[in-house]
Amino acid sequence: MTVEYETKQLTPAQIKIILDTVPILEEAGETLTQKFYQRMIGNYDEVKPFFNTTDQKLLRQPKILAFALLNYAKNIEDLTPLTDFVKQIVVKHIGLQVLPEHYPIVGTCLIQTMVELLPPEIANKDFLEAWTIAYGNLAKLLIDLEAAEYAKQPWRWFKDFKVTRIVQECKDVKSVYFTPVDKDLLPLPKPERGQYLCFRWKLPGEEFEISREYSVSEFPKENEYRISVRHVPGGKISGYIHNNLKVGDILKVAPPAGNFVYDPATDKELIFVAGGIGITPLLSMIERALEEGKNVKLLYSNRSAETRAFGNLFKEYKSKFGDKFQAIEYFSEDNNTDDKIVIDKAFNRKLTTDDLDFIAPEHDVYLVGPREFMKDIKEHLGKKNVPVKLEYFGPYDP
């Protein structure tokens, strides 16, 4: 489905129609977006790989779209307040490799869902025309912004990479190394520290490809990318990686993406807070910060010593960089804090917000972990006016 969008000026009457939709979206926006996704995913196979079934079941994707539609309607006369949010959408779309031909599918399903759910006296001809123009303007904005970002990328769409090594990092984490099949991609394009790669997986027995994003867990050496994956019970992709993936297999990989990246310009002390496998995008940042002579403090929370990845790497950092590097660890289900694993300090309990009381606006804070973990920490530090850089995988929380 190919449509060339052009920006069209909404009339005052059409602007009023969009603004009058705000109460409807406030009351029933999530119902509308749930129906929208059911319609789109049920009827258009080409968009199915973009969507994580867990995010759909937990209603993350419908919630974020409802939030986006509501705020687009509220700000239809001036989108300036949505600048940062639009940038987030663009970053996510680039990572997933959303293309211009996907936008008409979204627009068609959105209008059809409005017709289905809203009474005809509301979803009349004028209403549908106003929202068709409004959506077209938004699509044009996003397509143009994404085209500018795609032009910067070292390749387009998903390229074949061959698995070169698989390393067991701890009980339930494996690192996978892979290099491009197409030698024209060498030397390997370097990501910014903290970025991720999107993969398309075609698993045995699955009708459609599945997309997953994994952080680049080591700054590339020897023309290899590395990701490190925790085995999640019941997880289709993590289970496949841990139980079936082998050296020589081919992976479909999109270019590095994401705006959660290391800022080398800072002269502040750096605080890295990681929950479990959230450590992966932080590894190359920590490495670079220490190489630059900066003070780095890591707060690292895991269930147990058995499920704590990269402990030996952090011991190497301690040996090499001394007091420039401090690692404080938390094991929520383990009583093993003997000298063999402790780097600076270790506690047999969960990391809590009380452990962050020393953090002040004079620190630069990077945070990655489970959603609730990040939400609690961000809220706590926000009360102290401490800015936090963080990464959500999947839909952003509003």
Curated annotation (Swiss-Prot):
Pfam family, one: NAD_binding_1
E.C. no: 1.14.12.17
Active site: 103, 146
InterPro entries: Cbr1-like_FAD-bd_dom, FAD-bd_FR_type, FNR_nucleotide-bd, Globin, Globin-like_sf, Globin/Proto, OxRdtase_FAD/NAD-bd, Riboflavin_synthase-like_b-brl
Stated induction or repression of this protein's expression: Expression is under the control of the CDA4 transcription factor. Induced by nitric oxide, high-iron conditions, during transition to filamentous growth, by contact with host macrophages, and during oral infection. Expression is repressed by HAP43 and CWT1.
Residues that bind FAD: 196, 212-215, 395-398
Tagged with keyword Metal-binding: yes
Entry keyword set: Cytoplasm, Detoxification, FAD, Flavoprotein, Heme, Iron, Metal-binding, NAD, NADP, Oxidoreductase, Virulence
Regulation of activity: Inhibited by imidazoles.
Reaction catalyzed: 2 nitric oxide + NADPH + 2 O2 = 2 nitrate + NADP(+) + H(+); 2 nitric oxide + NADH + 2 O2 = 2 nitrate + NAD(+) + H(+)
GO molecular function (one): heme binding
Biological processes, Gene Ontology terms: cellular response to nitrosative stress; filamentous growth; filamentous growth of a population of unicellular organisms; nitric oxide catabolic process; response to toxic substance
Knockout mutant characteristics: Leads to increased susceptibility to neutrophils.
Positions of the record's site feature: Influences the redox potential of the prosthetic heme and FAD groups: 92
Binding positions (heme b): 93
Domain Globin: start-end pairs: 9-147
Record CDD domains: FHb_fungal-globin, flavohem_like_fad_nad_binding
Domain FAD-binding FR-type intervals: 156-263
Compartments where found: Cytoplasm
Binding-site residues for NADP(+), renumbered to this chain: 276-281
Annotated site, Involved in heme-bound ligand stabilization and O-O bond activation, chain positions: 37
Cofactors: FAD; heme b
Role according to the record: Nitric oxide dioxygenase involved in NO detoxification in an aerobic process, termed nitric oxide dioxygenase (NOD) reaction that utilizes O(2) and NAD(P)H to convert NO to nitrate, which protects the fungus from various noxious nitrogen compounds. Therefore, plays a central role in the inducible response to nitrosative stress. Plays a role in virulence since nitric oxide is generated by macrophages of the host immune system.
Domain notes: Consists of two distinct domains; a N-terminal heme-containing oxygen-binding domain and a C-terminal reductase domain with binding sites for FAD and NAD(P)H.
Similarity comment text for this entry: Belongs to the globin family.
Listed name of the protein: Flavohemoprotein
Source organism of this protein record: Candida albicans (strain SC5314 / ATCC MYA-2876)
Native organism taxonomy: Eukaryota, Fungi, Dikarya, Ascomycota, Saccharomycotina
